[in-house]
């Protein structure tokens, strides 16, 4: 048995997915990085607003509101970015290919034969 967080994963599953422990460690790091960015962002923006409050007067509740909302957006973007990197590592460890997120989507090919559907079903 292998511990992943609070749950235990069977050895057969770990053997089937060799990159599982690296992926879980990467995800844990991504979530901790997002949490840290939320806390540090809130504190930094709050004290930055307190310094600006000498110039622009507005109530403390708006300081808290703006700090929390902007830090939430920042934290979400950091966590999302790190999670995408973890997903890329997982796909690389599972398939051996590096996923290309910048490739253009190919349009589906239209067949010249109108008697077959896109699922290769023949119409009579």
Curated annotation (Swiss-Prot):
Transmembrane intervals: 29-48, 60-78
Disulfide bonds: none
Chain segments carrying region Disordered: 97-124
Any one Gene Ontology cellular component term annotated for this protein: membrane
Tagged with keyword Transmembrane helix: yes
Record key words, sorted: Membrane, Transmembrane, Transmembrane helix
InterPro entries: Tmem141, Tmem141_sf
Membrane topology value: Multi-pass membrane protein
Main localization, broad class: membrane
Source species taxonomy: Eukaryota, Metazoa, Chordata, Craniata, Vertebrata
Organism (species): Danio rerio (Zebrafish)
UniProt-annotated location(s): Membrane
Protein name as it appears in the record: Transmembrane protein 141
Pfam families listed in its UniProt record: TMEM141
Similarity annotation: Belongs to the TMEM141 family.
């Amino acid at each position: 048995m292998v511990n992943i967080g609070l749950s235990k994963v069977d050895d057969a599953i770990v053997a089937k997915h060799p990159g599982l422990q690296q992926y879980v460690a990467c995800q844990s790091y991504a979530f901790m990085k997002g949490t840290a960015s939320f806390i540090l962002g809130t504190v930094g923006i709050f004290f930055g607003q307190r310094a600006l409050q000498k110039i622009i007067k507005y109530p403390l509740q708006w300081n808290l509101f703006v700090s929390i909302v902007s830090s939430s957006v920042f934290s979400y973007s950091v966590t999302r970015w790190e999670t995408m990197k973890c997903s890329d590592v997982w796909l690389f460890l599972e398939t051996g290919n590096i996923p290309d997120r910048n490739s253009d989507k190919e349009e589906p090919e239209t067949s010249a034969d109108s008697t077959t559907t896109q699922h290769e079903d023949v119409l009579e």
